[in-house]
């Protein structure tokens, strides 16, 4: 199955000059969505993974069902102020400023192996922030999985030393 067939290009969104890669057609097709989860599970089958963590919101779409398929826990990573319990946070650099990510203080235990999942690897800012957050909690990043990678933005360069995989390269 060619997953690229289920990614819609939206020119000039969210602003002029940007092409947005819309995953909603993939979500609308159950066989394509299941294939996506199965492919991620297959790629990480031999990894030592205790938990999967994913950033809101689209990372949740893929991370939670993958965690269920692998029979491991899921950790939601959110913007500050969105989680009800005590949190730890990190700030990370974006192309035009900084942002923050948070998770519950007890979400990742010391030395737990965590697989990070997100929908798209673009500039690498969010991915780098997720790595910092897991490491701040004392966890180890086992790898990172993405549905698509925008190779022309070279986000992988911010993740040196971390095994990353993408199902689609754009």
From Swiss-Prot:
One GO BP annotation of this record: adenine salvage
Membrane-crossing residue ranges in chain numbering: none
Localization in the cell: Cytoplasm
One MF annotation (Gene Ontology) recorded for this entry: adenine phosphoribosyltransferase activity
A Pfam family: Pribosyltran
Family matches, as InterPro entries: Ade_phspho_trans, PRibTrfase_dom, PRTase-like, UPRTase/APRTase
E.C. no: 2.4.2.7
Gene Ontology CC annotations of this record: cytoplasm
CDD domains according to UniProt: PRTases_typeI
Signal sequence, start to end: none
Main subcellular location: cytoplasm
Pathway: Purine metabolism; AMP biosynthesis via salvage pathway; AMP from adenine: step 1/1
Catalytic reactions of this protein: AMP + diphosphate = 5-phospho-alpha-D-ribose 1-diphosphate + adenine
UniProt entry keywords in alphabetical sequence: Cytoplasm, Glycosyltransferase, Purine salvage, Transferase
Family according to the record: Belongs to the purine/pyrimidine phosphoribosyltransferase family.
Main function: Catalyzes a salvage reaction resulting in the formation of AMP, that is energically less costly than de novo synthesis.
Quaternary structure (record): Homodimer.
NCBIfam families registered for this protein in UniProt: apt, PRK02304.1-3, PRK02304.1-5
Protein name as annotated: Adenine phosphoribosyltransferase
Organism, as annotated: Maridesulfovibrio salexigens (strain ATCC 14822 / DSM 2638 / NCIMB 8403 / VKM B-1763)
Gene: apt
